[in-house]
Amino acid sequence: MRHLLSTRDLSRDEAVHILDVAEDMADVGTREIKKTPALRGRTVVNLFFEDSTRTRISFEAAAKRLSADVINFSAKGSSVSKGESLKDTAQTLQAMGADGVVVRHPSSGAPHTLAGSGWIDAGIVNAGDGTHEHPTQALLDAFTIRRRLHGTAARGKGLDGTRVVIVGDVLHSRVARSNAWLLTTLGAEVTLVAPPTLVPVGVGSWPVTVRYDLDAALAEGKPDAVMMLRIQAERMRAAFFPNPCEYARIWGLDDARLALLGPDTIVMHPGPMNRGLEISAAAADSERSTVREQVANGVSVRMAVLYLLLSGDGKADR
């Protein structure tokens, strides 16, 4: 694997292999010393042009557990804020000897540009580009679902027949896009639920079912997982729904809807959460919730991605 830019690029076998290596990395996390020398001598740069807490820290933890050297770059306070181009930034990192670059950028397609430009000879990981994709989030979501379904027998398995309902601001969600492609590649059945104003143009070409009524979607064959998406108000330049209270009433996972879910249905959220809007506090904190598991699993999955990207080996050094 040279780069990880989109979940659409992954075959089923490739996706399952990443999840299996992530299982090995999760085992590393159970040791007294939670490190492996797999990437000793390698340099990973976290190149973030957008604010991030969970993703940046998760990638940093992943790289350090693999014994890589980590450089954190933030656009704020850097030469980028003075007008430096992506090309010049990439060439600077090339001169510094970066082996892997984790990129988050507000412009859709920026990681693809970086990977195909020839400006830098490094493995590129897309950590979120505009409203396009966020592949490692989808991988950690798939990893979480697979572990909940299969436990210690998860290795080698996909998500065949698993029903996943993704609810909320699909229009602005790179998480929804990456999950739509990855989960279906792994065999899951995905339903998107959103207000008509928050459904993107062209969704008919996605391998998903689209619904506008959350209650009907939840009632049609109990889902195995319900994933709530954050309302991304910072990306909205118009009124996409009447008001927050109305949104929560029609499309939020409130206490009443939580009580109607099947006994084994899990509740997911990529974070950060707007409690009381897309998800109630009771749902977020319930035993069904995998929010904290997703954070922990994110480190294991990102360890797997960095390992496969930078080591050139398919077997983790355990």
Curated annotation (Swiss-Prot):
Pathway noted in the entry: Pyrimidine metabolism; UMP biosynthesis via de novo pathway; (S)-dihydroorotate from bicarbonate: step 2/3
Catalytic activity line of the entry: carbamoyl phosphate + L-aspartate = N-carbamoyl-L-aspartate + phosphate + H(+)
Keywords: Pyrimidine biosynthesis, Transferase
Binding site for carbamoyl phosphate: R54, T55, R104, H134, Q137, G271, P272
Gene3D superfamilies registered for this protein in UniProt: Aspartate/ornithine carbamoyltransferase
One function term, GO molecular function aspect: amino acid binding
Pfam families linked: OTCace, OTCace_N
Assigned EC number: 2.1.3.2
InterPro entries tied to this protein: Asp/Orn_carbamoyltranf_P-bd, Asp/Orn_carbamoylTrfase, Asp/Orn_carbamoylTrfase_sf, Asp_carbamoyltransf, Asp_carbamoyltransf_Asp/Orn-bd
Amino acids binding L-aspartate: K82, R174, R230
Biological processes, Gene Ontology terms: 'de novo' pyrimidine nucleobase biosynthetic process; 'de novo' UMP biosynthetic process; amino acid metabolic process
GO cellular component, one term: cytosol
UniProt entry tagged with the keyword DNA repair: no
Subunit structure: Heterododecamer (2C3:3R2) of six catalytic PyrB chains organized as two trimers (C3), and six regulatory PyrI chains organized as three dimers (R2).
Family according to the record: Belongs to the aspartate/ornithine carbamoyltransferase superfamily. ATCase family.
NCBIfam families given in the database record: asp_carb_tr, PRK00856.1
General function of this protein: Catalyzes the condensation of carbamoyl phosphate and aspartate to form carbamoyl aspartate and inorganic phosphate, the committed step in the de novo pyrimidine nucleotide biosynthesis pathway.
PANTHER family listed in its UniProt record: ASPARTATE CARBAMOYLTRANSFERASE (PTHR45753:SF6), ORNITHINE CARBAMOYLTRANSFERASE, MITOCHONDRIAL (PTHR45753)
Protein name: Aspartate carbamoyltransferase catalytic subunit
Organism expressing this protein natively: Clavibacter michiganensis subsp. michiganensis (strain NCPPB 382)
Gene symbol of the encoding locus: pyrB
